[in-house]
Amino acid sequence: MEKGREPMSATYRSFFGMTREAFDPDLGLKDILETQDITSIRQRFDYTLRLGAVGLLTGEVGSGKSTALRFVLSKLHPSEYKTIWITACSGSILEFYRLLISELNMGNTGCKSVMIKSIKKSIRQIVLEKKMKVVLVVDEASLIRLEVFAELHTITQFEQDSKPWLPIILAGRSNLIDKLMYQTSMPLASRIVARSHMEPINRQEMEQYILHHLAITGVKTNLFEDNAITAVHQGSGGILRKANHLARGALVAAAKDQSMTVTADHVRLASTEIF
């Protein structure tokens, strides 16, 4: 199956005159569509960073959380902000600290207390010597163990100083909220000042999304009939990753039929290949 994918991709791209893969999930920053959701997330994150607090971003798998994070963080001036991005796992607090130490380009040193001191020292140096603000972004935060949430607030506490040194952005699935509601998570949860949730997009937004992705490939007209857009929206439930697969598959089906327009039947055919 893998061997057949590239010729199939080249065939539909050639048929529709596309300059690149359609509905590519790995878009460059300049090609990301700034939706109302993303604008709202940006505003909430700006507020979180100003306060040096904790912000949340939740959403189901494929809803576009990581893309939204990349876009929002790209708007932070690189000479002013040092962004530390960690993709969380279900490991211990020590493993989390090791990930953080690695991103800070520090040596993997000692026990937990030594690591905490080293992390805080590194953050202080960035803030005081480089005159930069540090923001910690934890993607897939819903994978984190409860005992890690119970201790995570310690790296935001700097003795004899109320200055907000380390704002944190936590991104994950909706069960992230459940984990933060545990009593042991309260020291961290009490620092949350902003919360965003990536909702599935509606039918109108889906049409804008499809047109945007077609334009990225160099196609200036809407190849999708109205009922095809509705079929993509209904079939994906408004989840962007599913919509990408469906829409691309429908383009392949249309090209195979030598049809310059994508119909609902092409979308349904694509759905049988994907789901």
Identify the meaning behind each predicted range.
Residues 2-11, 70, 187, 204-275:
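C-terminal alpha-helical "lid" subdomain
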Residues 1-51, 268, 272:
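A short, basic N-terminal segment
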Residues 18-23, 81-83, 91-110:
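Conserved NTP-binding/hydrolysis module of P-loop NTPases
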Residues 86-89, 180, 193-206:
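Conserved AAA+ ATPase "SRH/arginine-finger" region at the nucleotide-binding site
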Residues 51-71:
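Walker A/P-loop nucleotide-binding motif
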Residues 73-76, 176-191:
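Short regulatory helix/loop adjacent to the ATP-binding pocket of P-loop NTPases
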Residues 55-58, 85, 137:
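Short hydrophobic/aromatic beta-strand immediately N-terminal to the Walker A/P-loop
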Residues 11-13, 92-95, 107-151, 159-164, ...:
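Mid-core helix/loop region of P-loop NTP-binding domains shared across ATPases and GTPases
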